[in-house]
Amino acid sequence: MIIRSPEPEVKILVDRDHIKTSFEEWARPGHFSRTIAKGPETTTWIWNLHADAHDFDSHTSDLEEISRKVFSAHFGQLSIIFLWLSGMYFHGARFSNYEAWLSDPTHIGPSAQVVWPIVGQEILNGDVGGGFRGIQITSGFFQLWRASGITSELQLYCTAIGALIFAALMLFAGWFHYHKAAPKLAWFQDVESMLNHHLAGLLGLGSLSWAGHQVHVSLPINQFLNAGVDPKEIPLPHEFILNRDLLAQLYPSFAEGATPFFTLNWSKYADFLTFRGGLDPVTGGLWLTDTAHHHLAIAILFLIAGHMYRTNWGIGHGLKDILEAHKGPFTGQGHKGLYEILTTSWHAQLSLNLAMLGSLTIVVAHHMYAMPPYPYLATDYGTQLSLFTHHMWIGGFLIVGAAAHAAIFMVRDYDPTTRYNDLLDRVLRHRDAIISHLNWACIFLGFHSFGLYIHNDTMSALGRPQDMFSDTAIQLQPVFAQWIQNTHALAPGATAPGATASTSLTWGGGDLVAVGGKVALLPIPLGTADFLVHHIHAFTIHVTVLILLKGVLFARSSRLIPDKANLGFRFPCDGPGRGGTCQVSAWDHVFLGLFWMYNSISVVIFHFSWKMQSDVWGSISDQGVVTHITGGNFAQSSITINGWLRDFLWAQASQVIQSYGSSLSAYGLFFLGAHFVWAFSLMFLFSGRGYWQELIESIVWAHNKLKVAPATQPRALSIVQGRAVGVTHYLLGGIATTWAFFLARIIAVG
């Protein structure tokens, strides 16, 4: 008798021809909702249409159908990203001075947009050097392209076409995986398989292929560019890939092929996989051989990580087991039940992902200046400032989004009957202690951090500089930060073998890298001024967290409104009969949190902008004397509120205010217009619904008199709609104002 092991069953994980493709739905706005599909009776209809179009939870309660819609929408999102990317590369190919910039990146500025001569707008085409007139761009694409080894506009053109093809492919995939082969719920919930594929596939093989590209294409091309070879003389990428001898001339170990790899003699490869630390003095960017090494190491880590979870082959970890084993002495059931939450509530899953991604984006913002990854990025001050500001804003929005979806999870997906004594339940049960302590911390930080500034303003006003908190009077040195800096500055010899410099020049150690007479990076000194503003950062961040966390922890119930869960995620007040219950919905906490997020990030980018202009960015003479843009005034000026207003906001706004008649004048107009958008928001935030409804009735009366009254009844915005419109214009106006202020300033002086 032969005993065979049972054949593994092949599970069918898709439904074929799940929903027929039809354009008829497109002709019926609001087809996803019975009420909205009826068409407009009042103007509120258009608001509801926009609010619910992508709220898939409101279309159906079937988790499988919701999952499929989200999955399909992701492909649409990817398609838009590829389309955008294609546009960026197309502008580089068609309208830019990329080839000229490549030949002389220190004297020529990057530009990829030339304004047509209509009503005199061609004034915006500034002279960026090399005889090219256009708008100076600050996105960092030129530096990225050089690091990738792109040497001609034709290559950019081909890449743009490739991205368009991918965009079309993504659109097709979105349609295919909803209409033709829609995955079943089991497929979406198979987390081990998902982790294996995302870790080993996306991150592992993704990093490996990038490392391969860096080694075989980017490194040799950049080596030629750094040596001053004309880009047109450099061999094409495929020649390096196909002809090993060509690479061996630059990196001798290539002649030995894979032998050192299999004989474990890996140090042979140290000519193109390095561990130097610091910056390349020619380009002011990280050593590209360091970054190739980094991506190879990351690839190996993720390829291993992608083989850790149990799928069809009965070996490896199961995520449920891992989570349920997480029990501490004070955490009751620990993470029991978390697996079920994360596989049945996409809001809970999204919330975690947004929190992680938001934090990571802010980490990216800081690394982009401290460890500038691309050639000639560090000396392009406009791009440095833009990249920092951009990643800070994006990170802030993602973190607020994390709180929003955590609250939606609490309202829509949390089932208190099945959750007892797990970590989340325990947090909810002592939420009063958490929130009241956090509130105390906010009050303490607010009064003390602001109090230090007010003290300084008062002493300064009374002419008593010796009694101020400053580096020259009463010092409040950030000793812990200085200790961390010092540790890192001394670390290279003791940690990585062969590392000649620390991970970042900002740590200290006296090294300075300048490219073409401009400072790329140098050790950043920290003093009393930084100590003060860092406590403002602590204050604003804690208040943001207080608002957002309160919204999540009290999303379902509170002492004021015990049945809050029944009212939903967003509601204006708890009915007409109960005063003092407005702005308590989870949505309102997100709304209020956005303002404090805006506060937090504004202080951060102001701090960064001024600190870099004062202590880092500037020019260096032949004698090695550094002249900073604002001459090191941060340490003495930023210790008073008056100093921030006078020497930062007012002094540095002169470029944007005086930009009329120059190529920077668009920023002057934006500065004006964005202030207007910001002020416009206050109209929505400070006036109530009744005021507008009264006004509307009067206007409708006039229309009736003239027999031009519309069939759709005009309605004032609801309370929630007014707040949404208000906060949108507030943030948009504020961010665009800052953008115009920063860019006009840094393009003029940088």
From Swiss-Prot:
Keyword Membrane: yes
Subcellular localization(s) per the UniProt record: Plastid, Chloroplast thylakoid membrane
Residue positions binding chlorophyll a: M683, Y691
Record-linked SUPFAM superfamilies: Photosystem I subunits PsaA/PsaB
Listed EC numbers: 1.97.1.12
Annotated phylloquinone binding sites: W692
Keyword terms, alphabetized: 4Fe-4S, Chlorophyll, Chloroplast, Chromophore, Electron transport, Iron, Iron-sulfur, Magnesium, Membrane, Metal-binding, Oxidoreductase, Photosynthesis, Photosystem I, Plastid, Thylakoid, Transmembrane, Transmembrane helix, Transport
TM segment ranges: 70-93, 156-179, 195-219, 291-309, 346-369, 385-411, 433-455, 531-549, 589-610, 664-686, 724-744
Positions contributing to chlorophyll a' binding: H675
Catalytic activities: reduced [plastocyanin] + hnu + oxidized [2Fe-2S]-[ferredoxin] = oxidized [plastocyanin] + reduced [2Fe-2S]-[ferredoxin]
MF GO annotations: 4 iron, 4 sulfur cluster binding; chlorophyll binding; electron transfer activity; magnesium ion binding; oxidoreductase activity
Topology class, membrane: Multi-pass membrane protein
Pfam family, one: PsaA_PsaB
Gene Ontology, cellular component aspect: chloroplast thylakoid membrane; photosystem I
Highest rank taxon of the organism: Eukaryota
Gene Ontology biological-process entries: photosynthesis
InterPro entries: PSI_PsaA, PSI_PsaA/B, PSI_PsaA/B_CS, PSI_PsaA/B_sf
Cofactor details (free text): P700 is a chlorophyll a/chlorophyll a' dimer, A0 is one or more chlorophyll a, A1 is one or both phylloquinones and FX is a shared 4Fe-4S iron-sulfur center.
Family statement drawn from the similarity comment of this UniProt entry: Belongs to the PsaA/PsaB family.
Protein role: PsaA and PsaB bind P700, the primary electron donor of photosystem I (PSI), as well as the electron acceptors A0, A1 and FX. PSI is a plastocyanin-ferredoxin oxidoreductase, converting photonic excitation into a charge separation, which transfers an electron from the donor P700 chlorophyll pair to the spectroscopically characterized acceptors A0, A1, FX, FA and FB in turn. Oxidized P700 is reduced on the lumenal side of the thylakoid membrane by plastocyanin.
Assembly and binders: The PsaA/B heterodimer binds the P700 chlorophyll special pair and subsequent electron acceptors. PSI consists of a core antenna complex that captures photons, and an electron transfer chain that converts photonic excitation into a charge separation. The eukaryotic PSI reaction center is composed of at least 11 subunits.
Protein name (record): Photosystem I P700 chlorophyll a apoprotein A1
Protein's organism: Helianthus annuus (Common sunflower)
